[in-house]
Regions:
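Short beta-strand scaffold segments in enzyme catalytic cores
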Residues: 83-85, 96-100, 134, 208, ...
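Active-site glycine- and acidic-residue-rich loops that bind
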Residues: 88-92, 144-155, 182-187
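Active-site beta-strand/loop signature of hydrolases that rely on acidic residues for catalysis
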Residues: 7, 22, 30-60, 82, ...
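CN hydrolase (nitrilase-like) catalytic-core segments centered on the catalytic cysteine
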Residues: 64-83, 153-222
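A short, polar/charged loop-to-alpha-helix boundary motif
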Residues: 112-126
Length: 222
């Protein structure tokens, strides 16, 4: 991988609780990114589940090495994928997770740590809390720091990612305009947050949100 990194963002409307339809959508984005010779393709938070996919949690959860995920990675060739899904972990624990895939295997997995339980967000009802922040080398010049949505609203987690050597901050999110409540501008808040981190740490950041309506939320990605 060259010093210049080409990162693509797949911002689309996931199907709630329908992994088959979402995998089909993912394969279409992968084909487009591969044709464009993108080095990295980032999908939104919970891209294979939908924002409210946890309502069908037991039907749609998957392990990090699910054959469908590995097949998606193989279809991407040399393009690195960051994919969001509900992970089935040990001891009947389920996580809001994002996996990094290359060459048909999972090379890194992040489990969301800062689970929101305010406004219209009730993630603590469904998911176990992640515990670790780390980074992963994706080339000679690049080290990927991966945090999911509300993780970025805890500055300590972002700082820890850069202490671990991140040179690129990747942030899949699932952010609806109405998620927090009236009086808070979610898109503007995210823009300020990502600009701040890039300025403070001198590193590029990539935020990827979904689009379209889902139940009582309107997503503003794209």
């Amino acid at each position: 991988m060259s010093q210049t990194l080409t990162v693509a963002a797949a911002q689309f409307a996931s199907h709630i609780g329908d992994p088959d339809a979402n995998f089909e959508e993912h394969h279409a984005w992968v084909a487009e990114a591969r044709a464009a010779e993108a080095d990295v393709l980032v999908f939104p938070e919970l891209s294979l589940a939908g924002h409210y996919g946890a309502e069908r949690l037991l039907d749609i959860t998957m392990k990090r090495n699910d054959p469908r995920l590995l097949a998606l990675s193989r279809a991407a060739g040399e393009t690195i994928l960051v994919v969001g899904f509900i992970e089935e972990g040990p001891a009947a624990q389920f996580y809001n997770a994002a996996g990094v895939y290359k060459g048909g295997r999972c090379i890194y997995l992040h489990r969301k740590i800062n689970l929101p339980s305010y406004g219209k967000l009730i993630e603590t009802k469904h998911y176990a809390q992640g515990r670790f922040v780390d980074t992963h080398a994706i080339g000679e010049d690049w080290r990927l720091g991966l945090l999911i949505c509300a993780d970025l609203w805890n500055p300590a987690l972002t700082h820890l990612s850069f202490l671990h050597g991140a040179t690129l901050l990747v942030s899949p999110i699932s952010s609806g305009v109405e998620a927090v409540g009236e009086g808070f501008d979610n898109p503007a808040g995210w823009a300020a947050t990502m600009h701040f981190y890039s300025m403070m740490y001198g590193a590029p950041s990539v935020m990827v949100n979904r689009v379209g309506p889902e139940q009582d939320l309107t997503f503003w990605g794209g």
